[in-house]
Amino acid sequence: VAISVDVVIKIEQDAYLKRITDQADMVLVDGKPLIWISKLYKRPVKAKISGSDLVPKLCEKAAEKGYTIFIIGGKDGIAEQAKRKLEKQLSGIKIVGTYAPPYGFEKDKNELDKINQMISDVHPDLLIGCFGCPKQEKWIYENYKKYDATVSVCAGATVDFLAGNIRRAPGWMSDHGLEWFYRFTQEPKRMFKRYFVDDIKIVSLMWKYRK
């Protein structure tokens, strides 16, 4: 699970998501603001590692070691586009499946059974789930024992980055905590509420948990 300011806000409002996060095998800090806050609290986190940083590295290692990958999520055709791009970039990569579930799939038992069987049929070493928070976290938590995949990773918009559908912020912007602004300039309508309404709540949470 990768924790950004947005995810912190969601965890504060969703006890179930908090429980899922607490039980995750790996939790990453995805966002410079959280690094700064950790230093302010004198409990510094060593580094920012976002899902979009981690997943390409995992794909490189998978190609090197011969591990298999399944990509699920994104709009129709995006996961397949990411597959084709990765196959051009990484010699030897084995992407054994992609799927873009329909809207509301997480509430459809037949669709969930279909997805779990689809994954189990190819038993990937790495499952990359890209539905956004909290859908991806809840789906993996509720289904990882029902499908056959060795490792499952929550990756959010990473499928769009892998496909080249959305460009990542330049390194200097990420290093200075401005990746959010770059994302906003790319998708202002979709991102306005997140960055200028929801995420502002982090200020009150900083005060609430100041001790």
Each predicted region: which residue ranges?
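Short Gly/Thr/Asp-enriched flexible loops that form oxyanion-binding sites at enzyme active sites
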Residues: 83, 137-146
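Proline-aspartate-enriched helix->loop->beta-strand connector
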Residues: 116-128, 133, 149
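Short glycine-rich anion-binding loops that position phosphate/pyrophosphate groups of nucleotides
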Residues: 4-8, 131-136, 158-159
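A transmembrane-helix-recognition feature enriched in membrane-embedded lipid enzymes
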Residues: 33-38, 168-211
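N-terminal nucleotide/polyanion-binding subdomain common to many enzyme families
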Residues: 1-53
